[in-house]
């Protein structure tokens, strides 16, 4: 169903999020780093970190090229939470996001938010390598590196830190202007920041590799992936972007390799979901996707069973993207027949059906899906099929429940707004659109839409009270966010 919702935006948030980091402590029996205390607490509480994270996530949604694909979002969050469940010092909820960017990179920021570039799927040979990058970023969060960086900058150069935070936001809206501002702001203190960053990167490797191993992934994947990055830097005139934001001296690679060698060797097979996610990312979100994806699918077709199935899925996806619906259906059919409850296959089958104006076929298939009640991806697919099939009330029934349980999913609010518009429920359409604006950090517009919704219902009604209460909540949120909007 995501084909109808896909966006193509251009923005970046990368280098700003990894500046000025200071090495903290980690109390683990397998780690030999000294305990440097918890001094970040004197600058930011966990609650403040989460509030700042909420603010920046909203800016990210509103400005960055997020891949708001339900299947990929579900996959990276499932993989991420598997890693988080084996991490120590977890003090915040975690959320994982995917940005459409052909540069290899990832970053973590306040409140347990981790962002991956789509290029990581292209360069990760297996699931353990992708997980190694995520474990590294998770470790930045659990060690509170960014909070400690803020403390150090406030102590040594407070105006530099305030300027850097302002540049982060500017970089979201205008990458060139934002990075130019950031470069100027940091010019006077760059060398100290780089040394801190190197120390933090090495610590995130050391802790991340433990998380990786405890989660059942191959610890050798981390040094192997780092070595790939170094090789690319050696033989390219332009190093990978991740090396600009995550310093990688030879000593860091040697340390990661030494630590992995001390761990029990593991033979780990990548999950089928990894191959399907990689095929989907390359097939839909890679600028050079046609030839690159075809070459990879040819290779997978000769591989193990999981790779072969992913290759067939990728071929069907390619055909669908080219509007060759009959070919896509024929290619997908054996997979769907073998696994009729597979969400990846059901999602693609829905897109094929809707592309051929066969909404009723999609509806009947999805209504009988085994995991419909528990799988958000299938629920969104069914709601979208109802909407495309001219049954907006059925769609609204699903989406009202969905948005109640998934308040941070803009896909749900967008579809609900479409359904309410088709039903001529103007106030409810405005309210749903307001939630989408709020998620994207556009609180003024959200409040304006809710005010319009409130004016269209009966004076003194329960519905009006609900709209007015939501307006009050958003105004309170604006007040909490004011310190960040002034940076």
From Swiss-Prot:
Enzyme class, broadest EC rank: hydrolase
Enzyme Commission number(s) of this protein = 3.4.-.-
One matching Pfam family: TPR_19
Q: Which InterPro entries match?
A: Mito/Outer_Membr_Metalloprot, Peptidase_M48, Protease_BepA, TPR-like_helical_dom_sf
Return the similarity comment: Belongs to the peptidase M48 family. BepA subfamily.
Q: What does this protein do?
A: Functions both as a chaperone and a metalloprotease. Maintains the integrity of the outer membrane by promoting either the assembly or the elimination of outer membrane proteins, depending on their folding state.
User: What name is this protein filed under?
Assistant: Beta-barrel assembly-enhancing protease
